Amino acid sequence: MKVTLVGNGRMGQQIAGIVNASDANVIHKVLDVSDAVTPEVFEGSDAIIDFTVRDAFLANYKAMIASGVPVVVGTTGWDELMPQIAEEVNAAGSSMLYSANFSLGVNVFFRTLREAARLIAPFEQFDIALSEQHHTGKADFPSGTAIKAAQEVLNNNPRKRTIVRELEDGKKLQSDELQVSSIRLGTVFGVHSAIIDSESDTIELTHTAKNRTGFASGAVRAAEWLAQQHAAKPGFYTMDDFLNDLFSA
């Protein structure tokens, strides 16, 4: 598989290392955030992997879609535009797979959280909140992974209806609000936790990333899957689609 990387930052370099270490895959081209992106630059590619920033992705995604090459996107911060972009992908007969986090471990965390949120829903004595920690260089908060985790709770526990990112001084948290707190500290790669609490006990679910290898290898595996999927059934996909296929194999 010939891969074009869009983004040459820390994640892009990690992905390049994994691709180059593989006998089956090769880096076809690497584009920096500042490079001009047109559909033609992707000629000869079997897959595109985008790890840039929101503004760069929004400036480039139309060219990536128009190229007809399947696109794996790890850039976060554009969730509100996802329905629109998914429509554009489907209308063009192209393929795109988006995930806020490609780590297999963190996606097991999502599925465990999903089940926990569902199980405690009938029992009002259990409350739930989320927290995330990242290095001081991470600009967005909460992280895309934390937002995905929060959505899992909202989708599976009707007692929680809205996400609260920051508490206002003097205002109490309402019972239907899900607090998602953020910490920026040192060089932390990423820690995501769900805390379920009652008067009797506390349950904690935590995923801790030790390095970027899990994210990068997951993105490459997702690109391999999407390249095959594109040939049979083009469309807009998420990590859940890939994992459902992977776990059922």
Curated annotation (Swiss-Prot):
Catalytic function, reaction form: (S)-2,3,4,5-tetrahydrodipicolinate + NAD(+) + H2O = (2S,4S)-4-hydroxy-2,3,4,5-tetrahydrodipicolinate + NADH + H(+); (S)-2,3,4,5-tetrahydrodipicolinate + NADP(+) + H2O = (2S,4S)-4-hydroxy-2,3,4,5-tetrahydrodipicolinate + NADPH + H(+)
Stored InterPro entries: DapB_C, DapB_N, DHDPR_bac, NAD(P)-bd_dom_sf
Record: residues binding (S)-2,3,4,5-tetrahydrodipicolinate: H135, G144, T145
Residues holding NAD(+): D32, G74, T75, T76, S99, A100, N101, F102
Subcellular localization: Cytoplasm
One GO cellular component, as annotated: cytosol
Keywords, alphabetical: Amino-acid biosynthesis, Cytoplasm, Diaminopimelate biosynthesis, Lysine biosynthesis, NAD, NADP, Oxidoreductase
Superkingdom classification of source: Bacteria
A Gene Ontology biological process term: diaminopimelate biosynthetic process
The keyword Amino-acid biosynthesis appears for this protein: yes
Active site per UniProt: H134 (proton donor/acceptor), K138 (proton donor)
Coiled-coil portions: none
Enzyme class: oxidoreductase
EC number: 1.17.1.8
This protein's pathway: Amino-acid biosynthesis; L-lysine biosynthesis via DAP pathway; (S)-tetrahydrodipicolinate from L-aspartate: step 4/4
GO molecular function per UniProt: 4-hydroxy-tetrahydrodipicolinate reductase; NAD binding; NADP binding; oxidoreductase activity, acting on CH or CH2 groups, NAD or NADP as acceptor
Keyword Oxidoreductase: yes
Biological role stated in the UniProt entry: Catalyzes the conversion of 4-hydroxy-tetrahydrodipicolinate (HTPA) to tetrahydrodipicolinate.
Family from the record: Belongs to the DapB family.
Protein name, as recorded: 4-hydroxy-tetrahydrodipicolinate reductase
